Each structure stands twice: as structure tokens, then as C-alpha cells.
Amino acid sequence: MGERSGKRELPLLPLRGLLVYPTMVLHLDVGREKSIRALEQAMVDDNKILLATQEEVHIEEPDAEQIYSIGTVARVKQMLKLPNGTIRVLVEGLQRAKIEEYLQKEDYFVVSITYLKEEKAEENEVEALMRSLLTHFEQYIKLSKKVSPETLTSVQDIEEPGRLADVIASHLPLKMKDKQEILETVNIQERLEILLTILNNEREVLELERKIGNRVKKQMERTQKEYYLREQMKAIQKELGDKDGRQGEVDELRAQLEKSDAPERIKAKIEKELERLEKMPSTSAEGSVIRTYIDTLFALPWTKTTEDNLDIKHAEEVLDEDHYGLEKPKERVLEYLAVQKLVNSMRGPILCLVGPPGVGKTSLARSVARALGREFVRISLGGVRDEAEIRGHRRTYVGALPGRIIQGMKQAGTINPVFLLDEIDKLASDFRGDPASALLEVLDPNQNDKFSDHYIEETYDLTNVMFITTANSLDTIPRPLLDRMEVISISGYTELEKLNILRGYLLPKQMEDHGLGKDKLQMNEDAMLKLVRLYTREAGVRNLNREAANVCRKAAKIIVGGEKKRVVVTAKTLEALLGKPRYRYGLAEKKDQVGSVTGLAWTQAGGDTLNVEVSILAGKGKLTLTGQLGDVMKESAQAAFSYIRSRASEWGIDPEFHEKNDIHIHVPEGAIPKDGPSAGITMATALVSALTGIPVKKEVGMTGEITLRGRVLPIGGLKEKCMSAHRAGLTTIILPKDNEKDIEDIPESVREALTFYPVEHLDEVLRHALTKQPVGDKK
């Protein structure tokens, strides 16, 4: 290669992503065939070659138009062939040059060039620019960790302004476009100004990076170690090309959304929340709130159901297997099944089981679920006084949660569970709201298809749910709420029912739990009856179950201790196991008594006899009532007393008896409060007997309310009262005529052992109760 009309011919080496300034010495790795041949040609001539940068890095075989026209003439100082076929070259930049013409393009590029001479500028201007450039470069080095401090020392020794600009530019991480601009600028002052502007921008960027770094550092110091680790993990994932944690989480939730059976409105809601979540940093507290909300919507059943088992015989078997008696609620469930089988679209009933503790209300609801083949959910409402417990909290509150209804549906996993609202009569209200009012929507079949929970902010359909509520009393349930439920009363178990429950359910279960087979423990009928009568007094069977467990524990101790291999419990040996009887029941009088009548009472624990005693004392007409009587019972005594005064002469009683005598009415067991109107005819009969001296038949028990005109009004609890009369040894029952229809509710064995006298007036009561009829002046 040589000179031609003031121009120089040189081989061309196109550079990718690299630019060489004059005076620069650096290594290059050359791998392209054309480039290797250009190097070989340079070594044949005078070791000179033109280094020019191609515009696009990714082009393997660039054309002349894709190579910058200005480059640097360099001297090849050393060549080393590497094992992989590439050549490592040590080059030194000499001078700027411009490509005038491409002389050869086939085997390698040969170009005609002209050298570019630097244009001088005003010395003072250049000197000022050089100083400013050095100052800015020094600040840049302090801020940047990419340039070593030793570089500043070597740069400060450079006196030529053009070389200074080239050396500083070579140490800056500039874009290729900016580097090429500096290379193409031959005017020294312009080159310094361009570089100063670029360096100033770089320094400002580094200042901003430093401020951001300090701010991030302070923020990281205030947060937990977990934040720092997550940031590191995020940076690592970014470097590896992985998706960051938040995006991966959102993608996972979107995949879950595709498979969800939620309605379109719910899917749209979830998608909107996902868009919000996507824009939030992984450490955002709001992000975790949104994630919890989305998880709640996913967890709720929207269409999943369990198929009802509509086999009535199967349902009847399951209900009878789990519970003895309880005919009314069982019958209602079977009716629902029958209608469901015919219609196949009936909404679930809303039942309210009312009765004393321990009669099986809660366990019956569980049995209903088993009979229907549905999921069972129970929530206790006892003591709940916050409306948010039912409807949930709005998501703006910290720690917000859905209400118990929605949580119960999540737990069920289906849209048609049996949902038990236990102890609905124990709801309370205060300044936080009235939960009973919130339940109005839940328990209304015409409204609960759009139940609104504050947390999920969307309506939820409860029409397929079978709601069952339980209560001990209806008195505390608000009227609008009670109106929405079908009330089924469950009275306390009779003695006979308890005996059957003990024999068929409780004792076998306790024997199994205590590892006692029939060959190890046997309890006869008399012992069971004694256990029911004298060791428990309750409407339900919870204490009876405990006493059965007590018997099993005592028997287990005897057997394990080696005293006996088999324990037989009789009425006599029961006391040895459980101690003295804890309760006693009233018994019939042993002989006919004057002024003493056996009444019949009903309590939450069942029926019992109630003796009423009357004494006539000399005095001035004072009426004394003792035995801890309630207001209603006192009024009944006064009504009976007034009625007897009005008819005293007809029964042979001194019309002036109330002026000459004090009358004392006493009901024994004074420590026990007593109230109610049903002892009215009992007290009236006792008064007539005491005033006439005619005894009352010992086998008679009675119940009924009395009026001032002697009429007998109906009462409640006849079944339990007659059971207690039978237990006490009574054989005759006097009852109001209006209660005659209730006789059929009494167990047949008891009904056949008793003689019933329905009455409408006190005269009829006296006719059946006294040993002889009082005789006086008839009007």
C-alpha cells in the first residue's frame, strides 16, 4: 500500500462496539475472515491499518455504508494466534483519518484515506477548558467506582489539549454515538467543549445515583432484614432474566383465575385487583391486603354443590340412629326431602329448634347434614354483639376479615351446606351495631340470594343453604327475626325417653369409650331407672351422660384392680359406685289428708309433683303465703281465696271465716322459687279441704288455672306433669277440659296407668278430689 495523489491506501479493520482514539494502546480479538486478512496485509506493509467502527454491532459482514467514515490509523505492534482460531492484536492509535474511497471490498477492505489535522484554537480558552475538564473529571472519578484514582494522576500530566480530550473520553462509559462525535471533531476547542458537556452530564447522573443510593440505604436501614434480602433476590432474578416475585405471583393468580368457576362479575373484580397488585412493589403492605382479598374470593364456593341424598328411608334411619325421639323436627326434615324429590328446586328451609340445654338441638343439625349428604358448618352466636361479626369488616380497616357467614361458606366449600347458627337467642347489641338486624337478610329466603358482606364487596347467594338455628328461649329473639324462621319446639325428655336414651345410646357409647364390653359391665333396668331419677335432674341428657361415664370409670377401676372380672350394676350397688342419691322426687301421700293436695308442676328439667298445704289458725283474716312463691302464684292464691269466700255457705263454710281465722298457704321446698298459674285449682282444693275438714284423696294429682268465677283454664307441660305423677305413684289426674287434646302426647304406658278427669269448673274438681262432697246452703 502506498501514497497516491496526497492520499494513503490502508487496509481497513471494522470494529464492533469499540472505538480507538489516537495515542490509545489496547488489545483486540479479531475473528472475522476479512478482518484477519486485513491484519495480515498490514503486517506485510508497514504495520499500519485503519480502525473504523461499524454503526450496527450485530451485523457480521458490514457494507461500506455501514461503517463510520472517520476512524483512527493505528500501528499493529503485536499479533498472537489463539487456539480457537481468533487473533489477539496489540494496536496503538496514531492519528485521525477520513475514508475517501473504498478501493477493495472482496477479500478485505482497502481504503484511500486522508489524515485529519487538529485545528488550533485560542490558547487561553483552551487552557480554561482543560482546567475545567480536569476538575470535572476529578469529581467524576470520586463519584464513579469504574475509574481508578491512578488514572487521574496520569491524565494530569498530559499537556496537549487534543490528547487530553481523547484520553479522558476513552475512560468514560459513553454511548458509541458520543464517542464517534468526539473522534470526528478535529477542532480542539469544540472537542473539549463537547467532552465537558458530556462529562458534566455524567457527573450529574452519578450525583443523582449517589443520592438515590443514600436514600435507598437509609430506607433499607429503617426496614427489616427481609426487605434487604428480597431486594437482593429481585436484582439477582433480574440479572438471570427471571421474572420478579410479584410478577410471578400475579401470573400464578391469573392462571388460577382461568380455572375458577366464579361468575363473570367476580372474575372481573379479581382481574381489577390483579392489575392493582401488579403495579405494587413486593414489599407493599397494601399488596398483602389485596392478595388476602383475592385468596378469599378464590376460596369461596360459587357453583360447587353436593348432591342431596333424597332417599327418605335412609334419612329416617340416620336420624333415628343418632337421636331417640325428637319426632317433630325429624318429620319436618323428611317433609323437606319429599318435596325436594318432587320439585327439585325448593329453597332450603330456615328452622329454629327451641328447647332446654342438652336435648340434642346441635347434634340433630349435624345428623340432618349426614342424612342429606351435605357439608355441615356451625358458628356460635353466643355473646356476639358486633354487626361486623356477621357482615365482615370493610377492607379499609387494618386486619379486616369477612363475616362469619362468608367464613362458614369458605369452610363448607359448597353452596348448599347445612348451616347451624347456634344460640341465636344469646345475641347482644351495643354501640357497634345489632347483629340480630344483620341476620334479617341472611334468614330471609326472599333476600338472601343477594347477601352483602362488607369485606368481599360483592353479593353472595345463600338460597341453597339450609339454615338451622337453635335457642333455649324465644323471649330474647327480636320479633322480625323470629318471624323469618319456622319454630320447632323440643321439650325436655321424659323419664321414659331418658331411660331409652341411656339404654340405647349413652351407656353403649361410654362402655366403648372406656374399653368395657358387655362381658365386663352390665347394668340392669332398675339401676338405669334409679340413675335417671335420683342422680340427674335436667331437661336434656348431658348430666346423664356424665353419670354413665362415671359408672364406667368406677367399673374400669374395679376390673383393672383385680377385685372383679365383671361388674353388674343393680339399684342396690349403684349407691356404692356413685354415692348417695343427689335428688329426690315428690311421692303420693300415704293416706288421705285434710288441707294437703298434690299439684303438678313443670320446669326446664321436666315435671315434678308440688304439694300445697293449708292451715287454718285463729286470727283476724290474714292470708299468709310462703314457699318462695312468685307474683303470678300469689295472685292465683288470692283469686282462689276470693272465690271460696263468695261460695262459702254453699260448701258449709262459715261465711265469716275470713274475719275469725288466719289462713296460711305453704308450698314445701321453700328454697326453690315457684311461679305460674297452674297451681290455682290445687290451692283452691286445699283451702276447701282445710275449711270443711274433708280429706283429699291421696291418689289424686291436679293442675289448672282458676278464675274468680271458678272456671278452670288450660295450662302447659301436661306431658311432663303426667310423667311425674306416674313416677310419684298417683293414679288419677284432674286437668282442664281444654288440655284434653294433649293427652295423646303422653306415652302410652303412662297413659294407660292413669285415669284422667277433664274439668271446666272447680265444682268438678272437688267432686273428683275430695273423699266426700261438702254440703251447705244451696242458692
Swiss-Prot record:
One of its GO terms (cellular component) is cytoplasm. Keywords: ATP-binding, Cytoplasm, Hydrolase, Nucleotide-binding, Protease, Serine protease, Stress response. Residues 10-203 form the Lon N-terminal domain. It catalyses: Hydrolysis of proteins in presence of ATP. Residues 591-772 form the Lon proteolytic domain. It comes from the Bacteria. Its EC number is 3.4.21.53. One of its GO terms (biological process) is cellular response to heat. PROSITE patterns: LON_N, LON_PROTEOLYTIC, LON_SER. ATP-dependent serine protease that mediates the selective degradation of mutant and abnormal proteins as well as certain short-lived regulatory proteins. Required for cellular homeostasis and for survival from DNA damage and developmental changes induced by stress. Degrades polypeptides processively to yield small peptide fragments that are 5 to 10 amino acids long. Binds to DNA in a double-stranded, site-specific manner. This is Lon protease. The lineage of its organism: Bacteria, Bacillati, Bacillota, Bacilli, Bacillales. The gene is lon.
